[in-house]
A protein has these predicted regions:
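Extracytoplasmic
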Residues: 1-188
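Short, acidic/polar N-cap/turn motifs at the starts of alpha helices
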Residues: 54, 80, 203, 207, ...
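Extended polysaccharide-engagement surfaces of secreted carbohydrate-active enzymes
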Residues: 54, 416, 429-712, 717-722
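Solvent-exposed beta-hairpin/edge-strand motifs
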Residues: 77-85, 713-728
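N-terminal module-boundary/linker segments of secreted carbohydrate-active enzymes
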Residues: 188-208
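Aromatic-lined, polymer-binding surfaces characteristic
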Residues: 209, 213-440
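C-terminal beta-strand-rich structural cap/linker in extracellular carbohydrate-active enzymes
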Residues: 729-746
Length: 746
C-alpha cells in the first residue's frame, strides 16, 4: 500500500513529538509569514560543526522516496547542512551528483517567497521499511579551493537559515498542499533600482588614478599585473598613465627584472605569484604589454642587458612560455581558453621581436580555434604530435555554443569575457573591431546561448534584476541565488558589465546592455566591483568601463531583450550535448540538467530549478536513460567530501550512504584511453534522457544517429511545447537525433 506524504512541522511541539525529534544546538522561532521554524546554531566556541536535528520519517517500502525541506527565501546564511540516513551521509559536500541539502552564500534566494529543496533517498535504505532515522547536521561553509582542511573547512560562526517543514513523498516534483502559505509575485512588483548613478564612474577614475600613481612611484620591482595595468592605461586618456614616458620606462625596467628572476628560477614561468594561475597565464601579461607599447619599446630592444640584447632576453621569456603552455593544455573549456590565449599572446609578442623563433601564426591561431570549437580539440603537444586524449573529434563547445565541463556549467560556463579577451588578442592593438571575425561570430553565438540562463528576479535590496542560473550547473557549488547578470558577468574579476556590447556593437548584445541600464543595475555592478579595488586584477578591469559606458549610451535603442523577460514569448531552449533545457511557459521558468554530474558512469540523476511567481523548487531527482552499455562498471567509493575525487577525505568517522552503488559505464569510443574510475565525458553520457517532473515531460536525444520513442502520458490534454504548443493526439512521439521534446500535461 502506497504511503501518503509525511510532514514534520518544525517548531510545532505536537508534530515534533510525533516524529520523535531530538535536537542539539537549535532554536525554534517565528519566521516568514508567521510560520514556525528551527535553525541550527554554532557552539559557544565556534567550530566547524554546529547544531543537529534528529527525527523519524515514514517512507514507502517499495517506491523511490524523496525528502524535501521548506525554506524562506528572505533568509540567508553562510553555512552548510548535510542530510544523514541511519547515520550515513547523503550526497557529497562539493559538486556531487547526489547533491547536498543546503549551502548558503550570504544571499537571499527568493525574497518574500518560500522555496522547496528535494533530494532522493537510496532505495537500499528504504526498501522493506516503514520509517527511517534521519539527521540534518550543520557545518561551517567551505572554501572550495582550500588544499588543507584548515583552509577548506570554515568555522560555523552564525546560525543556519530556518527550516520550516520537512516532507517525505514519492513524487520527484514536490507539490505543496493548497492551504500551505505562499508568498506573492514579488518579481513582477519589484521597482527599478534608484541608485547609485553616474557618480560611481568618477569614483572609479579616482581609484584607478590613485593606484597608477602609487605604482609609478614604487622603487621596488613590479609584478606582471602591475606592468600590464600601466601598459594598458597608457592609451586611456583620463588616467595619469596616458602617454606618460614613465610608463614606458617602468615596463622596460620590470621586464628586464623579470628576466633576472627567470635566470635565478626558471620555474617562475609557470609559477609567478604576481599573476593569477601562473601555470595558465605564464608571461601573458608581459606579452600584452610588449604588444600594446610596441611602437614605444622597439627602439630599446638592441640595448645590451646581462650580456645579451634586450630583444634576445625578452624573446627567451616568450619562448619558455610557449614551451610550457603548448605542453600543458587542459580540456576544461574555460581553462583551455585561458591557456591558449596566453600561448597566442606570447607568440604574437615573439613575432614582433624575433619572428624566426616564433611558432607559425596558423598554429597558435589553431589552438584558439580548438578552445572555441572552431576546430576539434587535440590536447597538449607531445614529441609525437598532439596527444588527442579525447580522440580526433572532441569539440570544446556544443553545437548550441555552450561549454562542456562535462555538461552545463553556470559560472565557469560564463566564458564570454574570455572570448572577448581572445578576440582582442587577435586584433591590431589600438584598432577597435579588428579581431578575428570567426572568433567574433563565435563569441556572439556563446553570448546568445548564455542569455537563456538569466531569469527575472530581485536583488538583495528588493529591486528588479536578472540573475544567472547556476542551480543546474555541474561546477556550481553554492550559487543559489546566482549573481545579478544581464549580458556579461560584470562583477567577475576580468569582466565588465557592458563588455560584449562594447566589443561587438551587435544589436542583441547592445539590447541586453540597454536592458541592464534601464533597470539601473549597471552602476550598482560597478559599485560592487569597486569594493574589490584592492585586487589589482579587478582594478585592471575598471580601465575601460567609462569608455564602454559612453559607447553604449551613443547607440540607438534596440528592441532585443533577454529571452526570459516577462514580456518575451514562451519558448524552449535545449542543448542535447549538454543535456540541459531552459523553458519559459507563461509565468513559469524551468531549468533542468538531465546529464548531471555523471563523471564516471551513467547515474540516472537530474537537477531541476523550477520557478513560479509565488515559490521555487530545486530538486535532485531520478530519471530514465538509454545508452550503449560498455559492460564495464563503476562502484561508488566511500567518499563524503568531493563528489569527484577521494583526495580530500578529511571527515573521519563519516561514511557515505551511496558507497558500494554499482553503476553502468557507457561505451567509450575506440582510441580514447579509459579505465573504470576515470572521469570521462563518454563514461556517463547516455544517448537518451527522459524526465517526468510535475506537469512536464522532457525527452532529450543526445545521439547523432538514433531515434527514440516517447510514450505520451494519459491525461486530459497534452501539449508539445517544442512544437508551437500543439495539442498531442498521438500515443507515441518520435524523438529524432539531437532533438528535444517537452510536453506539458494538463
Amino acid at each position: 500500500m502506497a504511503m501518503g506524504k509525511d510532514v514534520l512541522i518544525l517548531g510545532n511541539k505536537s508534530s515534533e513529538q510525533k516524529h520523535d525529534l531530538r535536537d542539539s544546538l537549535t532554536e525554534k522561532y517565528i519566521g516568514g509569514m508567521g510560520e514556525t521554524a528551527r535553525r541550527m546554531l554554532p557552539g559557544t566556541n565556534p567550530d566547524w560543526q554546529g547544531g543537529i536535528l534528529r527525527f523519524k520519517m515514514k517512507v514507502d517500502s517499495e517506491k523511490q522516496n524523496y525528502f524535501t525541506v521548506r525554506c524562506w527565501g528572505s533568509e540567508s546564511d553562510n553555512a552548510m547542512v548535510m542530510l544523514f540516513i541511519e547515520g550515513k551521509q547523503l550526497g557529497y559536500r562539493h559538486l556531487g551528483d547526489y547533491d547536498l541539502l543546503h549551502r548558503g552564500n550570504g544571499g537571499t534566494p527568493c525574497q518574500g517567497r518560500f522555496y522547496y529543496y528535494t533530494v532522493p533517498l537510496p532505495l537500499n535504505y528504504t526498501r522493506g521499511k516503514k520509517e527511517v532515522n534521519l539527521e540534518m547536521r550543520s557545518y561551517g561553509n567551505t572554501w572550495d579551493y582550500g588544499d588543507t582542511f584548515e583552509k577548506y573547512q570554515k568555522k560555523m560562526e552564525g546560525p543556519t537559515i530556518g527550516f520550516y517543514k520537512v516532507y517525505m513523498d514519492v513524487q520527484p516534483c514536490f507539490l505543496p498542499d493548497k492551504n500551505e502559505k505562499q508568498g506573492k509575485d514579488e518579481v513582477s512588483l519589484a521597482p527599478v533600482r534608484p541608485a547609485p548613478g553616474i557618480e560611481v564612474l568618477n569614483q572609479l577614475k579616482e581609484t584607478v588614478s590613485a593606484r597608477i600613481n602609487h605604482i609609478l612611484a614604487k622603487d621596488t620591482p613590479l609584478g606582471q599585473q602591475e606592468v600590464w595595468l600601466l601598459a594598458d592605461a597608457y592609451s586611456v586618456k583620463w588616467t595619469p598613465a596616458f602617454q606618460n614616458p614613465k610608463v614606458v620606462d617602468a615596463v622596460i625596467r620590470n621586464i628586464d627584472h623579470y628576466y633576472t628572476k627567470y635566470l635565478e628560477k626558471p620555474a617562475i614561468i609557470s609559477s609567478d605569484p604576481s599573476v593569477y594561475n601562473g601555470d595558465w597565464m605564464t608571461t601573458c601579461l608581459l606579452a600584452r604589454s610588449i604588444r600594446s607599447l610596441w611602437s614605444e619599446l622597439q627602439d630599446s630592444l638592441e640595448v645590451s642587458v646581462n650580456g645579451a640584447t634586450r630583444r634576445d632576453i625578452w624573446s627567451q621569456l616568450m619562448i619558455a612560455s610557449l614551451d610550457y603552455g603548448t605542453t600543458h593544455r587542459r580540456h576544461y573549456t574555460n581553462q583551455s581558453m585561458i591557456i591558449d590565449m596566453a600561448i597566442y599572446e606570447c607568440n604574437r609578442a615573439l613575432m614582433l621581436m624575433n619572428p624566426r623563433k616564433a611558432l607559425p601564426e596558423y598554429q597558435t591561431l589553431r589552438y584558439l580555434y580548438e578552445s572555441l570549437a572552431l576546430a576539434p580539440w587535440l590536447g597538449k603537444e607531445t614529441p609525437d604530435g598532439p596527444e588527442r586524449p579525447l580522440g580526433d573529434h572532441y569539440w570544446q563547445l556544443t553545437d548550441k555554443a555552450l561549454t562542456k565541463e562535462l555538461g552545463f556549467v553556470g559560472y565557469y560556463g560564463e566564458v564570454v569575457d574570455w572570448l572577448i579577451h581572445i578576440y582582442r588578442a587577435t586584433a591590431i592593438p589600438g584598432v577597435p573591431f579588428s579581431g578575428d571575425l570567426k572568433i567574433k561570430d563565435q563569441l556572439l553565438r556563446v553570448a546568445n546561448a548564455r542569455y537563456n540562463f538569466r531569469y527575472p528576479a530581485i536583488d538583495e535590496e528588493g529591486y528588479k534584476c536578472f540573475r544567472a542560473e547556476a542551480v543546474v550547473g555541474w561546477r556550481d557549488g553554492n550559487h543559489y541565488p546566482g549573481d545579478v547578470i544581464y549580458g556579461d558577468r560584470g562583477t567577475a574579476w576580468d569582466a565588465t558589465p557592458l563588455m560584449a556590447a562594447a566589443a561587438t556593437l551587435d544589436q542583441r548584445t547592445v539590447g541586453v546592455a540597454q536592458q541592464m541600464l534601464e533597470d539601473n543595475q549597471f552602476f550598482y555592478a560597478v559599485a560592487e566591483k569597486l569594493k574589490d579595488a584592492g585586487n589589482i586584477r579587478v582594478l585592471q578591469s575598471y580601465l575601460h568601463i567609462p569608455d564602454e559606458y559612453e559607447l553604449i549610451m551613443k547607440q540607438t535603442p534596440s528592441e532585443e531583450k533577454l529571452p526570459m523577460s516577462v514580456s518575451a514569448p514562451d519558448y524552449v531552449f535545449s542543448d542535447e550535448e549538454d543535456g540541459v533545457v531552459a523553458i519559459k511557459n507563461g509565468s513559469e521558468i524551468l531549468y533542468a540538467s538531465l546529464y548531471w554530474r555523471a563523471r564516471n558512469a551513467v547515474n540516472n540523476l537530474a537537477k531541476v530549478h523550477y520557478i513560479t511567481p509565488t515559490f521555487e523548487r530545486l530538486a535532485n531527482v531520478h530519471i530514465e536513460t538509454e545508452f550503449e552499455d560498455s559492460g564495464m562498471r563503476y562502484t561508488r567509493p566511500d567518499w563524503v567530501n568531493l563528489g569527484f575525487a577521494g583526495w580530500r577525505e578529511w571527515y573521519k568517522g563519516i561514511h557515505s550512504a551511496h558507497a558500494g552503488e554499482v553503476l553502468p559505464i557507457a561505451r567509450i569510443p575506440e582510441g580514447v584511453k579509459f579505465k573504470p574510475g576515470d572521469e570521462n565525458i563518454y563514461a556517463g553520457k547516455a544517448d537518451y534522457y527522459e524526465l517526468k517532473y510535475g506537469n512536464y515531460v522532457i525527452a532529450i536525444n543526445g545521439s547523432t544517429d538514433k531515434t527514440f520513442e516517447l510514450s505520451v502520458p494519459k491525461a486530459k490534454a497534452v501539449f508539445n511545447l517544442t512544437d508551437h504548443k500543439k495539442k498531442v493526439e498521438e500515443d507515441v512521439l518520435k524523438v529524432s537525433p539531437r532533438t528535444t521534446v517537452v510536453l506539458e500535461v494538463r
